[in-house]
Amino acid sequence: MATRRKDARPDEIRAAALALFAERGFAATRLDDVARRAGIAKGTIYLYFPTKEDLFRALVRQDLLPNLAALEQAAAAHPGPAPARLRDLLATMAARMGAPTAAIPRLILAESGNFPALARFYAEEVVARGLALLASVIAAGVAAGEFRPVDPAAVAPLAVAPLVMTLLGRNAIGRHVPATPGPDDLLATHLDLLLRGLAP
């Protein structure tokens, strides 16, 4: 039992950190707070994560990047034409923005000015890889004549930007603007506009 508990500690610490980062923000959360939330002694957390930045990097690598890898695999295995691949990819991205790990991009957007090294890490590990995935699907569509000739690298950030804005709006002012369409309606409208704009 003790061995299982010890093996589970990194997962428990990351879960506690994610919850606290979402509640308080990165800057306002201390490692001691995370240790208390995880139910471990203050000193124990430093055996696993010497700094708060190390803990954040572990969150990205252990909890976020596997989701991105799954998206890459699903896109590569998708049997449909490029428009269907792009639609399904963006729909899956949008669905995952409701998961607890959606707190991570929110943190980066909110606090990147104070933590440039973490912002750079996130940009290199997550953003660049996600944009490359989108660009590859768009490029395949252009090559197959399923999309009109466009620069995939220019279209990729435009394809995902409305999803990011919806995520931010939902957690900031969205609840104060009751007339705003729901996430599903916004996604459907975005996909319709995007795919019509890419049509040959």
Where are these regions (language model features)?
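Hydrophobic/aromatic residues within well-ordered alpha-helical segments
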Residues: R9, K52, D63, M97-I104, ...
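Amphipathic alpha-helical packing segments from all-alpha helical-bundle domains
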Residues: R96, A103, L107, A117-A143, ...
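Short, flexible, glycine-rich and Lys/Arg-enriched loop motifs at helix boundaries
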Residues: R61-P79, N171-A179
